[in-house]
From Swiss-Prot:
Alphabetically ordered keywords of this record: Ribonucleoprotein, Ribosomal protein, RNA-binding, rRNA-binding
PANTHER family to which the protein is assigned, alphabetical: 50S RIBOSOMAL PROTEIN L4, LARGE RIBOSOMAL SUBUNIT PROTEIN UL4M
Oligomer and partners: Part of the 50S ribosomal subunit.
Assigned protein family: Belongs to the universal ribosomal protein uL4 family.
InterPro entries referenced in this protein's UniProt entry, alphabetically: Ribosomal_uL4, Ribosomal_uL4-like, Ribosomal_uL4_dom_sf
Stated name of the protein: Large ribosomal subunit protein uL4
Top-rank lineage group of the source organism: Bacteria
Purpose of the protein: One of the primary rRNA binding proteins, this protein initially binds near the 5'-end of the 23S rRNA. It is important during the early stages of 50S assembly. It makes multiple contacts with different domains of the 23S rRNA in the assembled 50S subunit and ribosome.
């Protein structure tokens, strides 16, 4: 299969897309990102006395015990959130398959652009980054740029643009691929992308 003038592997860029697999991987990724630091106090943790607030009988009011129960304002929360880890295991095979499907989906929609080199000069300039995107005709799209090595000039030039994300091939993931309308990939990243979906 060819994308532009680049020959790519069918088993990575031309796989049958199953939406459910993509959904599974994205759900797993977002669950992993959750902080899970939410916390509420139960009736045992709120700062109230355990004294009975009114007699059991004779007042005409409903029966009550202490002030810290969940039915009172300022009382504890019943079944509220406690700190927890939302991460759960997802088979590697499914994760790799998800990435292949996401790349295949973009390839099918002509949303992948291969470039020989991304040269924005020696100093970070957002202006040059915008020019680069304009030359590719993707300045108004959400763009994922895949580069072969960490380059401060590239990261800093693109980071001021809210619709652009920059990743190394090893950091390529289903969520970011699906987020982008266009993928701009430097040609010498291809082998490392293949390695990622095989490893």
């Amino acid at each position: 299969m060819k994308i532009g003038d680049v020959e790519v592997r069918d088993d990575v860029f031309n796989v049958k897309v199953k939406k459910h697999v993509l959904w599974e991987v994205v759900k797993w990724q977002l669950a992993k990102r959750r902080q899970g630091t939410h916390s509420t106090k139960t009736r045992g943790e709120v700062a109230y006395s355990g004294r009975k607030i009114l007699p059991q009988k004779g007042t005409g009011n409903a029966r009550h015990g202490e002030r810290g129960v969940n039915i009172f304002v300022g009382g504890g929360v019943a079944h509220g959130p406690k700190p927890r880890d939302y991460e759960y295991p997802l088979p590697k095979r499914v994760r790799k398959l998800g990435l292949k499907m996401a790349l295949s989906d973009k390839a099918r929609n002509n949303a992948i652009i291969f470039v020989d080199n991304i040269d924005l000069g020696k100093k970070p300039k957002t202006k040059k980054a915008i020019e680069f995107l304009k030359n590719l005709g993707v300045e108004k799209e959400k763009v994922l740029v895949v580069i072969p090595e960490k380059a401060d000039v590239l990261y800093k030039s693109f980071r001021n643009l809210p619709n652009v994300r920059v990743l190394l091939p090893e950091g390529l993931n289903v969520y970011d691929v699906l987020w982008a309308n266009k993928l701009v990939i430097q040609k010498d990243c291809l082998d490392r992308i293949y390695k990622k979906v095989e490893a």
